[in-house]
């Protein structure tokens, strides 16, 4: 039964109402500093910890709760007579409920004007110590670190005569250990990122020790293949527009491959300003287009490769309306992603309950890092978010691209970044015409892309081509020109650039170098 609570919080959201409810239930309130003042100003009966322990706060508040009368009351096991006798001997009442959240270290170091001294002063000592004590003794002590749990605790207390069951205490304790681990991880990341220990501003993006925190969203039926087990975790720092923040409106449970492919589709479609549609199969775009609206964009994207689109993942950067829904519903689709779905669109898919509909806010945020596991290690890099500016483009051929060709080239370049290397993408009129992905030879990717267009009945005459990396020889260029391309965009940087540029002039096409490579493995 909860008779006495200690409350000390930095985030004071809802704390007055929570404390009032506890007081109304007959719970004695202990508190510190600013929290105690807030509760007292609200008219609540509260005892300062300094008065409770008989020992004043000291060292500018660095020592408040580090006292046997606090930690003894938290850590004592109620089922051990010797523990209870020790409390009685030293006149230490039990503390049955601990409500603590920590100094805002992460928010502090995010400020541009933060100094190392500021960061150090926002490393909480007493808070984590109390939290860990209470979480360790969770059989007897309820510990709350998240304001979202205030209502849960109150409801259970009211239903059980001020008592909290073991299941709730255990869940709250695990939440505490996760929270303190994340807190210490953030401190470690910060301190080991300093390249000059006297300068907050001098920080490496890659700390000497890297700690990351993820919460499990769900267990998955299996992994990439049925014999592999799997689960999906959400980055606690995920931006609003990230796939992990999806809301599933209907459909079967997402699979490992559904999630991986959905991320590829969503990241690609977000890069377009005009209404766009991206169709993904095995993490590669098999159709991308912009149009007047979602239905128009889908119709154009589907034309690229109707065969591969079967059972694909489809993403839109605009609301899916009834017209778009009716067009998509004619095909077999695994997952459909959009910022929103109209009521009429939802009604269309209500008859296809296996189709997974995901809503995600169309935010600008991206993951801070791109991660790849290797044997015994982790590769960490900044996200490939580079968008070339017109001023960075260099026309290296005698012929300049026309305005239409320039639009097609920039569209193709945007798509190529999301195609597995080696990537060759034919485009025209705001849509992909042929995609060659994942080949060991760039010339093979070029051949496959042209074959794909031929199989789809699409002409490549007058098309634009993007290559994610340079042409090592002229052979790849010869293939795309033979297929009908009249302009090419590529990074350049090959030791044979002059030979490739000369071949472009020989063919009478326009070529642009970006100076940016987009390998994707």
Swiss-Prot record:
HAMAP family: PurH (MF_00139). It catalyses: (6R)-10-formyltetrahydrofolate + 5-amino-1-(5-phospho-beta-D-ribosyl)imidazole-4-carboxamide = 5-formamido-1-(5-phospho-D-ribosyl)imidazole-4-carboxamide + (6S)-5,6,7,8-tetrahydrofolate; IMP + H2O = 5-formamido-1-(5-phospho-D-ribosyl)imidazole-4-carboxamide. Its EC number is 2.1.2.3, 3.5.4.10. GO terms for cellular component: cytosol. This is Bifunctional purine biosynthesis protein PurH. Residues 1-145 form the MGS-like domain. The keyword Hydrolase applies. The IMP cyclohydrolase activity resides in the N-terminal region. Belongs to the PurH family. GO terms for biological process: 'de novo' IMP biosynthetic process. Keywords: Hydrolase, Multifunctional enzyme, Purine biosynthesis, Transferase.
């Amino acid at each position: 039964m909860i008779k006495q609570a200690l409350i000390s919080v930095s985030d004071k959201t809802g704390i007055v109402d929570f404390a009032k409810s506890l007081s109304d239930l007959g719970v004695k309130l202990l508190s510190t500093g600013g929290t105690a003042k807030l509760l007292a100003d609200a008219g609540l009966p509260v005892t300062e910890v300094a008065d409770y322990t008989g020992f004043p706060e000291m060292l500018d508040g660095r020592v408040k709760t580090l006292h046997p009368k606090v930690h003894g009351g938290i850590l004592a096991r109620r089922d051990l007579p010797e523990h209870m006798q020790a409390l009685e001997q030293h006149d230490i009442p039990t503390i049955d409920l601990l409500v603590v959240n920590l100094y805002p270290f992460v928010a502090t170091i995010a400020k541009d004007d933060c100094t190392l001294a500021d960061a150090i002063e926002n490393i909480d000592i007493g808070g984590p110590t109390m939290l860990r004590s209470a979480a360790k003794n969770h059989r007897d002590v309820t510990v709350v670190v998240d304001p979202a749990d205030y209502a849960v605790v109150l409801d259970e207390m009211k239903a059980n005569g001020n008592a909290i069951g073991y299941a709730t205490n255990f869940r709250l304790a695990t939440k505490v250990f996760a929270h303190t681990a994340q807190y210490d991880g953030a401190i470690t990341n910060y301190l080991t990122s300093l390249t000059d220990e006297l300068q907050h501003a001098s920080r490496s993006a890659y700390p000497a020790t890297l700690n990351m925190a993820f919460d499990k969203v769900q267990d998955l039926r299996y992994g990439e293949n049925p014999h592999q087990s799997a689960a999906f975790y959400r980055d606690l720092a995920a931006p609003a527009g990230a796939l992990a923040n999806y809301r599933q409106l209907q459909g079967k449970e997402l699979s490992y491959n559904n999630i991986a492919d959905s991320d590829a589709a969503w990241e690609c479609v977000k890069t377009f300003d005009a209404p766009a549609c991206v169709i993904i199969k095995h993490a590669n775009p098999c159709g991308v287009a912009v149009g007047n609206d979602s239905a128009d964009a889908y119709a154009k994207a589907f034309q690229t490769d109707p065969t591969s689109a079967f059972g694909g993942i489809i993403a839109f950067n605009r609301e899916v309306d009834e017209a778009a829904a009716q067009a998509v519903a004619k095909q077999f689709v695994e997952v459909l992603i959009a910022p929103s779905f109209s009521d009429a669109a939802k009604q269309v898919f209500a008859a296809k309950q296996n189709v997974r509909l995901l809503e995600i806010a169309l935010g600008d945020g991206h993951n801070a890092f791109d991660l790849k596991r290797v044997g015994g290690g982790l590769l960490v890099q900044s996200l490939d978010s580079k968008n070339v500016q017109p001023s960075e483009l260099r026309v290296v051929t005698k012929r300049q691209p026309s305005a239409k060709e320039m639009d097609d080239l920039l569209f193709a370049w945007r798509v190529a970044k999301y195609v597995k290397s080696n990537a060759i993408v034919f485009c025209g009129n705001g849509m992909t015409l042929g995609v060659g992905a994942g080949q060991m030879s760039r010339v093979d990717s070029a051949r496959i892309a042209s074959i794909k267009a031929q199989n789809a009945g699409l002409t490549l005459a007058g098309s634009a081509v993007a290559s994610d990396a340079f042409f090592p020889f002229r052979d790849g260029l010869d293939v795309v020109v033979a297929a009908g391309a009249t302009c090419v965009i590529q990074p350049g940087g090959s030791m044979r650039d002059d030979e490739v540029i000369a071949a472009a002039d020989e063919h009478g096409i326009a070529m642009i170098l970006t100076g940016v490579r987009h390998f994707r493995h």
